[in-house]
Regions:
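N-terminal helical capping/dimerization or prosegment-like subdomains
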Residues: 1-82, 86-90, 322, 424
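Buried hydrophobic packing segments
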Residues: 121-131, 160, 218, 264-268, ...
Length: 424
């Protein structure tokens, strides 16, 4: 693969990346009058400042929902769709280094956002700058669009699309090389049910993360422990609580994770048969493809459905289950919803659609896909075919956009996990 990036530019890139990683840009809605939190506002402003230093023209939405950096000339607009918000760091004890300090450990940079998506976003910016410095002439304007709400509801891009110029083509550097031409539909659901005076329980952090911890601190702890032992789940124990341990993964790869909420619910439901626990244990179970609920749902372009039971809250007043479902591009979403409503109702749970993103599909023979694949293969010699994904990137927010990079085939995927890292 040709190397067009000079060493001094690489050093500048790493310094800039360490700077923007240092902002803990996790959603904190409404903080200090910002839409999504002060740290998100600050990292947006800092990233645009860095872009201006590289020669880009910048703009920030007056309300702080998004910003962009643009360079070049031409009538056509190519968008590079990025985001600067990140998922929570989770339990700091699981990190070898502070998550918001971007520490170099051997050949890796470790920190929240180095893979998803601060690292790829900044790498693409410096790549364009390096090409321009080498005298490469572009016939299109290139606009880096920086979203701030990708990990939750995409309100940043909703606002952008209401106001701003639409791109003619583009890509999101928020997946893997060579290219993702199909992304499953993303349905996020909350199921509301009755509370319980004697069952305080809260587990899971984000809907798009397989929960790796679920803690019970109720008075029936002594009854629960032998049930957990018999189930075979991994857990840790303190004097007054027990925490079931799982393996965190992105929801799109839920089948590769171990869901701690499911592990706890299957045992706890045997001694406290609360409707939410019974739904999880009996109707869902450990299968992360949703087959127990829906039957086998799959298609040729995008593969199996992915089902992540991501959050659970039970208190005196109510219970709430949060679910993330990645729906194959040819599947019938409404039929799935009808089935989920029916089963949930039988457990006294009321369905609420929290968020939905329609699937992405750009044909393999389209000019965009053909061009990007040709460039990738010429530069790398790698003949890995274009692929589909259960992930949801900003590529689906605009017409004629795909996910392009930034992980190479075989690279370790650590986004949304402790010790998120990228090779440097």
């Amino acid at each position: 693969m040709k190397n067009r990036i000079k060493n001094d530019v690489k050093e500048q890139f790493l310094n800039s990346l360490q700077t923007i990683i240092s902002y803990p840009s996790v959603l904190n809605e409404g903080e200090n009058g910002t839409p999504f939190g002060q740290a998100i506002q600050d990292v947006l402003e800092k990233t645009l400042e860095l872009a201006r230093e590289l020669g880009f023209q910048t703009y920030i939405d007056p309300e702080g929902y998004y910003g962009y950096a643009e360079i070049g000339q031409g009538e056509e607009l190519l968008a590079v769709l990025c985001h600067l918000d990140v998922v929570p760091a989770g339990d700091l004890k699981d990190w070898q280094t502070p998550p918001f300090e971007a520490t170099i450990v051997g050949d890796y940079l470790v920190g929240r956002g180095v893979q998803d998506d601060k690292g790829p976003s900044l790498a693409a910016l410096y790549a364009v700058k390096s090409l321009l410095d080498d005298g490469i002439q572009f016939t299109k304007r290139i606009r880096f669009i920086y979203g701030t709400d990708e990990e939750t509801l995409w309100r940043c891009m909703n606002r952008y699309n209401q106001i701003e110029e639409q791109a003619d083509l583009g890509f999101a550097p928020d997946s893997s090389f060579p290219l993702t031409y199909a992304e499953k539909g993303l349905l996020q659901v909350k199921l509301h049910g009755p509370g319980w005076d004697d069952l305080p329980l809260q587990a899971g952090q984000a809907l798009n993360v397989v929960p790796d911890k679920a803690t019970y601190a109720g008075h029936r702890l002594e009854e629960l422990l032998p049930v957990l032992d018999q189930s075979g789940v991994q857990y840790s124990q303190t004097e007054d609580s027990v925490t079931v341990l799982g393996v965190s993964k992105h929801s799109k790869d839920a089948a590769e994770g171990v869901n701690a909420i499911v592990g706890l619910a299957e045992s706890l439901s045997l001694i406290q048969p609360h409707p939410a626990l019974l739904f999880i244990a009996d109707a869902v179970g450990e299968d992360a493809t949703g087959e127990a609920l829906f039957g086998k749902i799959t298609d040729e372009p995008s593969g199996d459905l992915s089902f992540n039971l991501a959050t659970l809250v039970i208190d005196q007043e109510q219970s709430e289950i949060g679910i993330d479902i990645r729906i194959p591009v040819l599947a019938d979403k409404e039929a799935l919803v009808a089935r989920l409503r029916e089963i949930a109702a039988s457990y006294q749970l009321e369905y609420e659609e929290f968020d939905y993103l329609a699937p992405l599909y750009v044909p393999l023979d389209s000019p965009l896909v053909s061009s990007l694949m040709a460039v990738y293969q010429e530069e790398t010699g790698d003949k890995t075919p274009a692929m589909s994904s259960g992930g949801a990137t900003f590529a689906r927010t605009m017409e004629n956009c795909v996910a392009f990079g930034a992980l190479f085939p075989g690279a370790e995927q650590t986004e949304h996990q402790a010790n998120e890292r990228a090779k440097i």
